[in-house]
């Protein structure tokens, strides 16, 4: 019985492999057309509400350095299941670009996450983020163009755009993050400089051709601040695009700041210190008025507009009048509020949580009313109870993908007419990513989950029989598939190189031609990318 069971499992593994080959062929065969993609307005109409994978891919040098594990298919599927139709992937590039050239391994790493999002059926925004505090671009918006910055903008976006040129309209590029955080007063020269860099971004992407000729692109407001943008960046200042109707505009929303982000008392020149605020809307605490959202230390009273939906409505109405109505769809690329778990407990924490539900619902309601796409900021730091956090979907502990604040998510879902949240689980295989091929609609790449998506490098792996190994090699050669993993062995039709997710070379196969093998025993825990020819394969070593 044991032998028959073993052969049955072997046959099932081979059948599963052949199914994946068939899927790969389908993915490669579905070539995207260079015909015009849907316009920005058409794209935005399907974006619903969105979710940020924050504090991850934008971390300089190492996407796991700030405590979040590398994004997985399980996470992206969970984002979709929670009711989000869009995901924003903040991303670092400069720290992965020695000599100005982005490493191919980092491009493959980013592609892996983009492919996860595509398989989950999500509209996907990929940007150049801040690369640390300020970075090479964000805090360097001067009154004249810096040629080094301009060159980087062109080089990076040319490389990024070429990597993704065949992806469909569900992939969107965003030029920056929050440009100019150090500028208190934007002059026309500052605005002109920023718009010049955006022109470089747009021209670089369009020049790569393919679907990038009409891909939706996003430019950011002045520090993504609503009032600064309205005051100093009207559409007349915008860069020019070769095609009409393919640009979006981005702002962020964290109002009132004392409620959403402030973590310590500040002295801003009022007659009393400015304190963090914990209670919002209908859930304010009468015995602590200074802790209520909208409390004005200069006036000694709560500004009722800041304590309810009137403020986001007023702000988002400005976006509609100044940008949406003039042909530029608007996304609220980030919004969110810290949960005050270190400071509050008991009934105070419950009151705070009730107010959080109302705040998130108010923001999403106002955004939808004025035709904006709201995208929730998530830092993924739910496992750290020592400071305020902004984590809505679990990333750092099991089960990955669990919604942490169901009441908040359900309030947001309700605005879009969705029912209460139900976890639908993982529906995709994670370890088969064809290098160089396009990811079409998610239904084309959905296959049942398999235990083969991870390996345990320290565990004993039953050796493949010589006949099954020969059969596998024959299938690999006959189908043109250049890279596959069985157990703790990679098989390829040329030299195999193995990298960690930061682009460091880990090991290579000895041969550079013909059928090759690479053993995986002894790897440290983590995620790896194997490459053979134009094929890439990502896997997890536990």
Where on the chain are the PLM-derived regions?
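Short, Lys/Arg-enriched N-terminal segments with co-localized hydrophobic residues
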Residues: 2-13
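C-terminal outer-membrane/trafficking sorting elements
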Residues: 5-6, 455-542
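Bacterial N-terminal signal peptides that target proteins for export
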Residues: 12-22
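Hydrophobic h-region of N-terminal signal peptides that target proteins for export
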Residues: 25-34
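Active-site mouth of glycoside hydrolases
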Residues: 38-216, 220-232, 383, 395-416
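Anion (oxyanion) recognition and catalysis
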Residues: 118, 324, 364, 368
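Active-site region of glycoside hydrolase catalytic domains
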Residues: 151-307, 317-337, 369-370
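Aromatic-rich peripheral "rim/lid" segments of glycoside hydrolase catalytic domains that contact
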Residues: 342-439
